[in-house]
UniProtKB/Swiss-Prot annotation:
Homodimer. InterPro entries: Citrate_synth-like_lrg_a-sub, Citrate_synth-like_sm_a-sub, Citrate_synthase, Citrate_synthase_AS, Citrate_synthase_euk, Citrate_synthase_sf. It comes from Katsuwonus pelamis (Skipjack tuna). Oxaloacetate binds at R359, R431, R451. Residues 1-30 form a transit peptide. The gene is cs. This is Citrate synthase, mitochondrial. Pathway: Carbohydrate metabolism; tricarboxylic acid cycle; isocitrate from oxaloacetate: step 1/2. The active site is at H304, H350, D405. Its main location: mitochondrion. It comes from the Eukaryota.
Amino acid sequence: MSFLSVSRLAPKLLNSKNATYFLVAARNASASTTNLKDVLSDLIPKEQSRIKNFKQQYGKTNIGQITVDMVYGGMRGMKGLVYETSVLDPEEGIRFRGYSIPECQKLLPKAPGGEEPLPEGLFWLLVTGQVPTEEQVKWVSKEWAKRAALPSHVVTMLDNFPTNLHPMSQFSAAITALNSESSFARAYSEGVHKTKYWEFVYEDSMDLIAKLPCIAAKIYRNLYREGSSIGAIDSNLDWSHNFTNMLGYSEAQFTELMRLYLTIHSDHEGGNVSAHTSHLVGSALSDPYLSFSAAMNGLAGPLHGLANQEVLVWLTALQKEMGGEVSDERMRDYIWNTLKSGRVVPGYGHAVLRKTDPRYTCQREFALKHLPNDPMFKLVAQLYKIVPNVLLEQGKAKNPWPNVDAHSGVLLQYYGMTEMNYYTVLFGVSRALGVLAQLVWSRALGFPLERPKSMSTDGLMTLVGAKSG
């Protein structure tokens, strides 16, 4: 059994006597190795062999049917991608390499004195399938600190963007400009063998993740802090701590929130716009900078990465109209009026989930601990009591429960980050952890160019025997 397979068993056994044994078994072989690339070098041949054998035995097996509704409906529910780093269960929510968010909060290393998991630990888990040791997480922190400096042309570019250019446009453009530093693009042009592709994609991915907080902080300072300096990276601090320092936030609780935020927004299966875009563009052997920049252009769309802004706008309008504390009955009437006017309650419902998003739950727990009396949080908590019941009464929603976006903006506002246009940049920094971990594996496993078959409406009608016109 491979280490990846063993580690996937562990979450199912967490409540058993054997849980510790399996967790240790999943880590022992590489626990003494802090270099992530060395661990990958050991794992990749085993996973290649496992998948090769699987394809040989089951390559022609049918795994589902495709309906006309699926083709017209954004391919919802269509099984068409292999994505290793996370799986979204409709009832349980996201699992990172088999581990739920509560399990990750419990098992992943934390900063000294901290209570939230370090994103470096989650990245190690996403890449290897193994829960890392504290030493392995420290290695990642130092490695990213070492790689964080931005090339001068990117700094100049960021400093010369007009202030009316959206933060996500700046973010995407700067990432694209980093393509000049791509190890993969250079190696490919020199004729590197395809079995070595993953090594250079790994190097680019590590460099890019290291540099993203610097890009994001530079954008924030230029737009909202009069272009003040982001300062220097401290190699003794973790990735999130350096990020909050560069943003100009020194409160320890905000740094803890950022660790949680960057962890839970990192990955959400492979079919969402940003993950699928990265996978698609990467399949053309575009380097990680180009692939991730394309993903960020998808994330910038209102239907993907702007949802938490829409929640805050709606909450602010609700507060303005309803005043201070609002009775449950008045709140219920307001929600019904929203629905009857043809609008939705932002932050509720999800394309896949059918229960409360565990990413919402862990943010709620953070708020209950650190800001229980904040008026905006109390409003969010009140909505959590009322909205699902109203949506169930209405009878239209497949999922009446809150998602991650129903809460994240409120937490950021509480700690003083009120610039809503910037929130998607934070989302983007986080999402790099998941999609780039998968990009490394896509090249390691030799995934081909993505090229599905498209059809015209007339072609579909002919296929199913329908009359056109």
